[in-house]
Amino acid sequence: MTQTLSQLENRGAFIERHIGPDAVQQQEMLNAVGAESLNALTGQIVPKDIQLATPPQVGEAATEYAALAELKAIAGRNKRFTSYIGMGYTAVQLPPVILRNMLENPGWYTAYTPYQPEVSQGRLEALLNFQQVTLDLTGLDMASASLLDEATAAAEAMAMAKRVSKLKNANRFFVASDVHPQTLDVVRTRAETFGFDVIVDDAAKALDHQDVFGVLLQQVGSTGEIHDYSALISELKARKVVVSVAADFMALVLLTAPGKQGADIVFGSAQRFGVPMGYGGPHAAFFAAKDEFKRSMPGRIIGVSKDAAGNTALRMAMQTREQHIRREKANSNICTSQVLLANIASLYAVYHGPVGLKRIANRIHRLTDILAAGLQQKGLKLRHAHYFDTLCVEVADKAAVLARAEAAEINLRSDIHNAVGITLDETTTRENVAQLFNVLLGDSHGLNIETLDKDVALDSRSIQQSMLRDDAILTHPVFNRYHSETEMMRYMHSLERKDLALNQAMIPLGSCTMKLNAAAEMIPITWPEFAELHPFCPPEQAEGYHQMISQLSDWLVKLTGYDAVCMQPNSGAQGEYAGLLAIRHYHESRNEGHRDICLIPASAHGTNPASAHMAGMQVVVVACDKNGNIDLDDLRAKAEQHAANLSCIMVTYPSTHGVYEETIREVCEVVHQFGGQVYLDGANMNAQVGITSPGFIGADVSHLNLHKTFCIPHGGGGPGMGPIGVKAHLAPFVPGHSVVQIEGMLTRQGAVSAAPFGSASILPISWMYIRMMGAEGLKQASQVAILNANYIASRLKDAYPVLYTGRDGRVAHECILDIRPLKEETGISELDIAKRLIDYGFHAPTMSFPVAGTLMVEPTESEGKAELDRFIDAMLAIRAEIDQVKAGVWPQEDNPLVNAPHIQSELVAEWAHPYSREVAVFPAGVADKYWPTVKRLDDVYGDRNLFCSCVPISDYQ
C-alpha cells in the first residue's frame, strides 16, 4: 500500500522512541494480562466517572528536529547581555571536561537518589567531596550534600536555629539589612507560617533587639561590603543567640571562614563553582553547622561507613532526621536536593584545586580593585571601602549611566538608591573592565588598565587584614591530583562506573517514575541562550524564556484541568509547601485563618505531613481500609469532627498503594462539604496524563513533579521542579517575587524559591517532551505505563502476592509486592531481595513504602518488553533461591540473598559459602554484568561513627 506524505513525514516518530514496547510487544503484553487493547485496559482500571472523553488539546506531536528548531527560535528571543547584577548569581566558566563527561552524560544525570548505596558509590564520593569543600571553606564541622538554593537554605537555617536554640521563649529572628532581597523574601514567607517575627535592621543593631533566637548575617553583603563580624558574633553567642551566615564560595577562598569567627550555621549558593546562571537555576546550596547541631540539620548528609567485608563505603547518614521516616516531625520536608549541581561544583573544585581556585578568586578581586581604583581616581565614590568582587558606586546621573550600559549590552544592579552595583566574576576580562569605565565615566576617561594594575598590586587594602584567610584549604589529595584533562576525565569515569543509572538498566522504583530522559530533551539546557541569563535581568531580555514558560504553563493547565500554573517551586516538596500556602492564604482571605487541620491518609508519602507542618497546619491521619483505599467512614468522621477548622486534605492519585480509588470524587466532595480544599499530590501524575486530570477529578491544587512525569532527569538526587496548578479561586495566592515583577507573577504572596521561575533552565526539558509527544502520545505513554505495571504484576503475582489491586485485580502504574509472608517462612526480607537484584544487574524497587516489608515496582512506559522480562526473570529466579533456603539447601544465615551483593574481589578470595561463585555473581544466566564496588553497607556503624568528610585517599584505591 502506498503511504501518504503525512505517514512518510512521521511527525510522531518520537513517541515510538520514548515508549519502550512497540505495537507487537504491547499486544503480547495485553494478551498476557487479558485485555484487548490499551483503551480497553484503561477502561477496566480507571473509574468511569473520571475518564476524560478526549485527551487535552496540547497539539500534535513534532519530530525531535522540528521541536529543537522551534525551541531554538524561541530561545533566540533572549538577549544575552553581560550581567554584573550579582545578588548571588554570576557568570561562570564550566570546564568542558565536566560539561561533556558529566552534565551531558546519562551515566550521571539519569541516576536516582542514592538510597541504595551499593550502586551509588561514585556520586556519593563526589558528594562527599562537595561536603569537604563546604567544610574547608566555612570552617565548620558538619556539612550537608546540598539544599535547593541559597534563599531556601536561609529559611532552613532559621528553622534550625529555632530547633537548637536554648532561648525557648524567644520568637524573633533578626536579618541583617544587607542580605540579598530574594533571601529575605523567602525567609519572611517561612517565618509567617512558623509564627516568627522577622526583624530587618543594620547588623550593628542586632544587639539592640530582645527575644531574638537567631541572627542572619551576609558575608559578603549584598551590595559588596566585607564585614568583620568577629566581635558581633562573640557578643551574640554570649547571649545564646544562634548565628547564621550567608556566604559565597568564591569569596571564602580568600576570606576568613565564618566558622572560625564563631558562626553556628553557614550556607550559600555553590552556583559560581561552574554552574550556569540559567535564569535562576538549578543551583546547589551548601549548608554547614557545628557538630553539636548535626542531628538538627536539614537535607541529605553523606557519611563514611563500612561494608559487610569491612571495606570503607559511603552512604546517606542519619536518615532518621528526614521526611521519609519522621514525617511531620522531620527537620525539613526536603526530598529531592540538587545532587547533579552539587557534583558539578564538587568536580569544579577537584579540577581547579586550591591553587586554581585561589588564582580565579585573586583574578576576580584584582580586576575589582582595578575598577575601583579607576573610578575613585575620576572622582566617583564607593559606598564600601572593603569588598571582594562587588562595588556599590554612587553616580550623579544614574539614568545616563544605565542608558550607556544598555547601549553596551551590559546589565548593572539598578535597585540601589543613587548608586549602581557591579559584580565581577571569573568570566570578566581586562577588556570588560575598560568597557565598564566607558559606561560609568564616558569614553574620554583616559584610564589605563596596566597602570592601575601596578598601583593596586602594590597597595590593595580592599580586604581587611583581619579578614584574609590564613589557613590552608582543600588539602585532601582528591583536590590536588586531577588537574590535567586526561586525569580528570578518567577520575569522573571511575566514579561513573561505580553507579547504576538508566543507561545500564531499568530503575523500577515505585513512586519515582524513572522514565527516559531523551537526548533531544536535554540538548537545550546547555544552549547559551538559556544558560547564560541572569534571573533579575530586565524582562525584555528574557522574552524567549517567557514565551517558553507561557507555552509550557498553558500545556500544563490543559493537562491538569486547572486554571493557572505557578512555576516557582524548585522541587516537589517546595510545590507541596507552595500549594498548602495558597490554601492557607485563601482561608485567611475569607476570615477563616483558623482553618489549620490537614487530613492526610496513613499511606501518604512523608513529604505530605512534613510540608503540612511547615505550612503551619496540624496533621490528622485518615485511616485506610483493608484494600488500601481511604476509609470513607473515617474520612467523614474526621472531616465532620474538625469541620470548623478543616483546611484541606492531601491525597495522592492513583493512591500510593498503586490503585485508582473508585471513591476519589466522593473524597473531594466530603472535604469540600466541610469547608476544606483538596490538595492532590502529583507524584503519580504519570498515570493520569491524557486519561484524567486533578481538576476534572475535583481537586483544587496540585504540584507536578516535572522530574517524574515530564522527563526532567533525577540527576542522582536532583534537580527537580515542582510547579503547582490551581483552580481560579486559589490563583491569587500562589507565590510572588519581590525582585522581579512580571506578568504572571503579580500576586502579593511571598516567594518560596530564590528565583521567580525556580530552576528555569531545565523547563525546556518538559517543553520538549510535551511538544514531541503531543496529546495522543502523552495519553499513550500513560496507558503503556499502566500496561507495563500490570504485565509485571500478572507475571509475578504467583511468586510474590500483589498487596493491593483495584477492580478485576488490576493495578495502576505501579504495584506493591508483599514480601512479608516469605520473610515469616524463610527469614529472607525485602532488603535481601533488593540487594540480590544488584547481582542480577538491577536497581531495587522501592523498599518498605508505603507498607513495611514490601517492594513497590514502577516500570514506566519507557521500558520495553525485553527489559521487563529480564526483571521478571530475575525476580522469579530470586524466588527460586528463596525456595532453596526454605527447603534447607542453603542455611538462612549463609545464602546468596543475605550475602548480596557480591563483588569482584570475592571471586579470587577464599570461598567458604555453600553456593558457587557462579551462583553468586552470574546467577540465572546474567550476561551483561554490572559490578558493585562494595558489599552491603553497615548502616548502624555509619550512624554510630558519623564521619562526613573525605577519607584518606588509600581508602579509595
Curated annotation (Swiss-Prot):
Record-annotated disulphide pairs: none
Descriptive protein name: Glycine dehydrogenase (decarboxylating)
GO cellular component term of the entry, any: glycine cleavage complex
Catalysed conversion reaction: N(6)-[(R)-lipoyl]-L-lysyl-[glycine-cleavage complex H protein] + glycine + H(+) = N(6)-[(R)-S(8)-aminomethyldihydrolipoyl]-L-lysyl-[glycine-cleavage complex H protein] + CO2
Source organism phylogeny: Bacteria, Pseudomonadati, Pseudomonadota, Gammaproteobacteria, Enterobacterales
EC top class, as a word: oxidoreductase
Pfam families (alphabetical): GcvP2_C (PF21478), GDC-P (PF02347)
Organism: Salmonella newport (strain SL254)
Record PANTHER family: GLYCINE DEHYDROGENASE (DECARBOXYLATING), GLYCINE DEHYDROGENASE, DECARBOXYLATING
SUPFAM superfamilies for this protein: PLP-dependent transferases (SSF53383)
Gene this chain is encoded by: gcvP
Cofactor(s) annotated in UniProt: pyridoxal 5'-phosphate
Subunit annotation: The glycine cleavage system is composed of four proteins: P, T, L and H.
Highest taxon of the lineage: Bacteria
GO BP terms: glycine decarboxylation via glycine cleavage system
